[in-house]
């Protein structure tokens, strides 16, 4: 049973106007301002791969330092910074964004829609993602990269233990990234609900749509705690609000509660889209329909719920 409005053929005038709107001008501004889902998806993939390379180089630097005892390739401060940047890059700027790239590219094709439901929001999500990564790595220009681990446990992130700007870069960069991920998740959910082709009912949606929609909903519940933790950390350091300072009535455990409320479902947020893609590719190459489609959907949703 179709759950969307019946298809209507546009007039020639309307079709010409829509083609003009959807056309991407072959200029620098046109390419930068494009809202085409395929281009944005490819940008996610390329940018995520760049961050993968950066994270890999950081891992190689750490392994080189540990290759033999008593090497002095990195100072203790530089090692802590590279260790933190490696974990932060791989977890936040590669693992999830690479899957966003695939989803941005494939979702409209799978749903039979022209584009994502909110194309400009889609573009905003990418540019915020890119800006947050550039902002994080700009800390290297002043020699103050984050240095307290990718999990940034309090109280080591307090101003008296980390007086430079290291953890300020961390808190603000992740805050920008959470905004990017949140608006992107909203876009995915709206696209699923409003942009399905005629005849594409909920129970006919491909598994990849279900898996990405599940993690998009998880993101909307999980990321606010991380955003709040980063705001508290920045306020702690720059406005002396003492959220994590036990000497002033705060609690270092508050950071862990907020961070891991996000961290536990994040594992499944990263895994489920990949499982969704595998659940589409394997039946395709086997030339067989997916066995137990309904049960796979139920398992996907339950995995997202249990992640919390």
Please identify what each model-predicted range represents.
Residues 2-308:
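Membrane-embedded and interfacial regions of multi-pass energy-transducing membrane proteins
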